[in-house]
């Protein structure tokens, strides 16, 4: 992924059980194959320790649903730390919308769809404006996910805000 973006890493972290050892002259932390944290969680914790604020996670959504869900939960961890995290895959972008944001999340009409998924308890005060399916101060629970597959109105931007709790925002290109 790094080569495709023309990025040279400052730090490489992993156990290299599924990839060969990197051929970069870069600081590398080699992890044991058997450990409590995944490579990605360890890397994010190390970046937090080093003072990073914004996190772009690429290549963390794939064939293994367990790893994908674990990586999505990293976004919750980052939000709890007051940091910003985004996951990007071939089709979508994911981020957390929470009461910590302090302002509405803006979604432009370049996205085909967007969904709000509750992945952590009851979320209250959910407001969606500028979308095909608006909401005003609604409640979304894990059991009732009615924020799936919404659309930004043509020529508009949608705004999403949360009064209490956290939602996963998935913007589909």
Predicted regions and their residues:
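Short beta-strand segments
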Residues: 58-60, 88, 117-118
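Long, charged alpha-helical interface segments
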Residues: 92, 97-173
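Short, acidic/small-residue loops that bind anionic groups at enzyme active sites
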Residues: 77-94
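Residue-identity detector for threonine
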Residues: 26-28, 38-40, 68, 86, ...
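Acidic/Gly/His-enriched mid-domain segments of enzyme catalytic cores or analogous surface patches
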Residues: 1-81
